[in-house]
């Protein structure tokens, strides 16, 4: 049984997401304790969230034009801290998704480049083989055909026969009998 490579990147992202929850809880605790954090970071988003939520609920129930009272500071700080914690988890999760997408795109791009390089190498090899084939075909056409060789052999024997008849020497007869 072949075991594939363990996806270390996915394990790393899962670890980051698991660490983000306690991190969000620490941020919430710090937001509750720090006056600056509470006043400038937690309260404005909490009041805005409360206003949008209440306005939406009022419109759904059919009440229009009613004024919405802002949350008291304690409730707004609590809601702001919760929103901040959830935003932290969301941002970490979104960051992990973006990193995973980027990693996948990089792998895909590398794979396509490898395929393109292999394709180009195959095309080069086919071109080289086509040139070699053309050269071999040209050599084959330049060579005399088998029937032409037979004709030349017959002419050679006729010439030998004529030379032998003309000189009638024993050497010529011996030479023609060897062939």
Curated annotation (Swiss-Prot):
Main location: mitochondrion
Keywords: Coiled coil, Mitochondrion
Compartments where found: Mitochondrion
Biological process, per Gene Ontology: bone development; fat cell differentiation; mitochondrion organization; neuromuscular process; regulation of growth; regulation of lipid metabolic process; visual perception
GO cellular component, one term: mitochondrion
Keyword presence, Mitochondrion: yes
Residue ranges of coiled coil: 120-143
Family statement: Belongs to the OPA3 family.
Function: May play some role in mitochondrial processes.
PANTHER family, per the entry: OPTIC ATROPHY 3 PROTEIN (PTHR12499:SF0), OPTIC ATROPHY 3 PROTEIN OPA3 (PTHR12499)
Protein name: Optic atrophy 3 protein homolog
């Amino acid at each position: 049984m072949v075991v594939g490579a363990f996806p270390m990147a996915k394990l790393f992202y899962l670890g980051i997401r698991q660490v983000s929850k306690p991190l969000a809880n620490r941020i919430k605790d710090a937001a509750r304790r720090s006056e600056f954090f509470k006043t400038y970071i937690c309260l404005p988003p909490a009041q805005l969230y409360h206003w949008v939520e209440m306005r939406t609920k009022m419109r759904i129930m059919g009440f229009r034009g009613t004024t919405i009272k802002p949350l008291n500071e304690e409730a707004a700080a609590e809601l702001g801290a919760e929103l901040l914690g959830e935003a932290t988890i969301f941002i970490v999760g979104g960051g992990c998704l973006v990193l995973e997408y980027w990693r996948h795109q990089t792998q895909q791009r590398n794979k396509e480049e490898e395929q393109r390089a292999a394709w180009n190498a195959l095309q080069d090899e086919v071109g080289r083989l086509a040139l070699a084939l053309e050269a071999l075909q040209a050599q084959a056409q330049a060579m005399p055909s088998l029937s032409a060789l037979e004709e030349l052999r017959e002419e050679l024997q006729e010439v030998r026969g004529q030379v032998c008849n003309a000189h009638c020497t024993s050497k010529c007869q011996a030479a023609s009998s060897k062939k």
